[in-house]
Amino acid sequence: MAYSKLGRTSSQRKALLRDLATDLIINERIQTTEQKAKELRPVVEKLITLGKRGDLHARRQVASFVRKENAGEKDAIQKLFEDVAPRYAERQGGYTRIMKVGPRRGDGAEVVIIELV
């Protein structure tokens, strides 16, 4: 499968996607560049699908990827399994939406908002 390198090494790219995925789960809406959003979409879709499965192995797989951050009184993993995943119980994929905002002022990079549907 093709992917974008995002100008980073593989470990930096993985760290970036972990951070963005955790932020998207916690906030349910983030603003980033178009390429980062396009790379983030399949990662988050897989995490939500694991959340829908809901068993112990799925929870451990998500825990190995998502950062240990608090989302209010819950952490990101709890929020994924208790709030986000049940919302999509009847939906077969397509959990995210990307909306274009326009070019960023400093460097002209195309900025988008990626959010959970």
UniProtKB/Swiss-Prot annotation:
PROSITE patterns: RIBOSOMAL_L17 (PS01167). It comes from the Bacteria. One of its GO terms (molecular function) is structural constituent of ribosome. GO terms for biological process: translation. InterPro entries: Ribosomal_bL17, Ribosomal_bL17_CS, Ribosomal_bL17_sf. Keywords: Ribonucleoprotein, Ribosomal protein. GO terms for cellular component: cytosolic large ribosomal subunit. HAMAP family: Ribosomal_bL17. Part of the 50S ribosomal subunit. Contacts protein L32. Belongs to the bacterial ribosomal protein bL17 family. This is Large ribosomal subunit protein bL17.
